[in-house]
Amino acid sequence: MTNQLKPWHFKQLPLQKRTGGEIFSCLFISDSSKIATLLESPYPNNLNNPQLTRYSICAGSPRVIDGVEQMWTPQLGEVQDVLNRLLARKLNKTTDFNSSPYLPFTGGWLGWLGYDVAWETETLPKLKTDNLPFPVAFWYEPECFAVLDHWEQVLWLAASNKSELDELEEKIYQQKLDLSDDTSIISDAIPSLKLITSQADYEAAVLQAKKYIQAGDIFQTNLSIRFETQTDASGWEIYLALQKINPSPFASYFKTPWGE
């Protein structure tokens, strides 16, 4: 782990009603890197609370400092220690940022913390097996990123050096961004789905949740069912199709070495 923090260079462009998915597709999804991130708020904006869907954030591959990719996947039991060291590094280092705007993300780390991180602070029974390849914790510092201000219709580009910033701007002006007609994987054919959770197990979980609520142990729970199927579509194509069929008030897409 390196202690060096590099500055960012920012550039402001008109957004022109482009979506997070359009900017992400133009700048980062075609990148040869195995890592890219999209945190997207949709149009139209929430008229009553426009700040709730004001920003989208997208980013590409990790920064490389002193030959080391700025990416972390600590094991369970080490997550909080690694986070504390990273935060201490950031707080103890003053960096002269180049025209850093007031935005929800001005450089730092993108990724996730899985529910299993709770095992670092509580002693809980492990009742379920996790057969997915994704690490319980993953985050990285991107080499470049974009922040979309849907409210002010401003696109902020950020990169580690000015030449990369110019390359991002050139991509924006050269490539077609419209994804509105990309419905190639939406069809009337319904693929067969294999449910990982049985109906009986799901109904039993619902009844158990009701008991917890009645006892005052919890006031809310979110139950889910995992299923799988076979498709030739990429994870990004599936994301676009789902956003078209049923837009979410907030959505995310991660391209990682372990899957999408």
For each predicted feature, which ranges?
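Extended alpha-helical targeting/anchoring segments
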Residues: 1-260
